[in-house]
Amino acid sequence: MSPSTSSKGKSSGLNQHYEEKVRPCIDLVDSLRSLGVEKDLNLPAIAVIGDQSSGKSSVLEALSGVALPRGTGIVTRCPLVLKLKKISKDNNWHQWHGLMSYRDQTKKLKDPAEIENAVLKAQTVLAGTGEGISHEMITLEIQSSDVPDLTLIDLPGIARVATGNQPKDIEKQIKDLIEKYIKRQETISLVVVPANIDIATTEALQMASKVDSTGQRTLGILTKPDLVDKGMEETVVRTVNNQVIQLKKGYMIVKCRGQQDINEKLDLVEALEKERHFFDEHAHFRSLLEEGKATIPLLAERLTKELVEHITKTLPQLQKQLEMKLEKTTEDLRALGAGVPTDEHEKNNFLIAKIRQFIDALEGIKKAEEDLRSSDMRVFTKIRKEFDRWKTVLDAKTIKTEETLRDEVEEYVGTRRGRELPGFVNYRTFENIVKKHIEELEEPALKLLKDVTDIVHSCVNRIVSSHFKAFSHLLRATKDPIEDFLDEQFQKAEEKIHSQFKMERIVYSQDHLYSNKLDTVKQNLKVLGQRPFISAEVREMAQHLTAYFMITSDHLANQVPLIVQYHILDQYISQLQNAMLAMIGRNNPGMLLQEDSDVARKRRELKERLERLKSAGKVLSKFVHSV
């Protein structure tokens, strides 16, 4: 069997095997891409990359059967999605059909000769009149009996140096665009490399290797085999046979139309015959044809097979991606809330509903029942931690008092003893020591007030922002009472704490409480330790002081938190709730509900994304149930 016969046999068998599977798989991804979900999901794709003048455009031209822009410099200035759809030969009306779309424009093409100018015009619209590039996509769909079932994404050729009107950083711009596509695990990189150069030096192969170090997603295509220097043919053969730089998907080699062929008006059909003849007659490259590694027709079959297998392989992950994006988009849209109605009556009801939701959220704080979706810990849990710290301060003070009382009492007795006989406790000394220690606790109590106020303030601000962030006027109208009422309640709580400590400096306790506590202290031999040489009067006073401080500590451990909670939580929240209810009848709903343009835009984008994802879900579901 001759090489050409062998090639035809392979083609026929492959088409029969894949005929029922190929088009639905490729149509699935094309449908998803046409819905615009490529903004949201990583779709399976084959991206064609190569250095400038690598022959990339010629390969695509040969695969599609139409002349694409070619020449020196940057020819491809935008990503070009090339959708090739094979149709039946007996349908004359659909013998050839072209459709180009970009942004919101669509153009039907009746003749293959129109394509080159149509692509150039589209690139000018998207990338400007200079030589810059754009990330915006052009889609070119071709239906013909002479094309394979295949979709490719053509990316700009890599420029090493900016020339002419090109931006100074053109190399970086192009590489960033290419990397955006090829770094995705869902993308197969089709790397086009001239056969007459050292492939290790090509930027395209280096870029592919950077994001796909094992070559799992990379297929190498060698071009321009007719330009290989004599003596280098075996190196090319070794490269195609994966013996130089190894890729899991390997290499293929093709010969496309050169400039001389174009000048001589060699059409694409004749070019394919010329290519087959070249490999058939070549002493070194004939073996590559026999092994199915050469010519455009075999490359087309290989790419179709690779794409179908890749789509099938990535489908479960695509479904998972879609579900996650749907959930996230739905949640984001819910967080933004519904848009403002246009009817004035409905607008008023909308405002009432928004304010009541806010009031309910405030009530949740007060009752320690708030929604935890926006926070990892309830406000009252944080406040309780502050109350516990206050109790720790009191306990530490009591322990410190026990340790230092001896010296303090001795100092007072030694310097301030009056006419009392030995053994009599000086009550004035007792009072002075009590007042001194009580004063030292006032500052930590005020710090507790400030810390709890900060917690409540932060929480209320977070809640008001989550409810009203879309409405700047309503947000501002709410901010004033938030600050004013909090300042008011803070001052009231502060005054009460000052008053509380003034009262604590008045030494008093119920007799039975004091006596019971004193008995406990006297029974505890650790109060003053077993320190020798301590006088009876010092021991006696120290025991009385310790007993009194324990009573005071228990009292303050509850009283200060009650003052703080009453004013900063209960009174403040209630005052704020009443002010919000009063706002309903006092203000113009239309003015309060003027929505920020950024929020409206974001809601619109989220709604559009949700619709895209839902449509994509239907397409995916239909495909899964049909196979």
Swiss-Prot record:
Residues 255-258 are annotated as: G5 motif. SMART domains: DYNc (SM00053), GED (SM00302). Residues 75-77 are annotated as: G2 motif. Residues 223-226 are annotated as: G4 motif. One of its GO terms (cellular component) is presynapse. GO terms for molecular function: GTP binding; GTPase activity; microtubule binding. InterPro entries: Dynamin, Dynamin_GTPase, Dynamin_GTPase_CS, Dynamin_N, Dynamin_stalk, G_DYNAMIN_dom, GED, GED_dom. Pfam families: Dynamin_M (PF01031), Dynamin_N (PF00350), GED (PF02212). Residues 50-57 are annotated as: G1 motif. It is found in: Cytoplasm. GTP binds at residues 50-57, 154-158, 223-226. One of its GO terms (biological process) is receptor internalization. It comes from the Eukaryota. Residues 538-627 form the GED domain. Residues 40-316 form the Dynamin-type G domain. Residues 154-157 are annotated as: G3 motif. This is Interferon-induced GTP-binding protein Mx. It comes from Ctenopharyngodon idella (Grass carp).
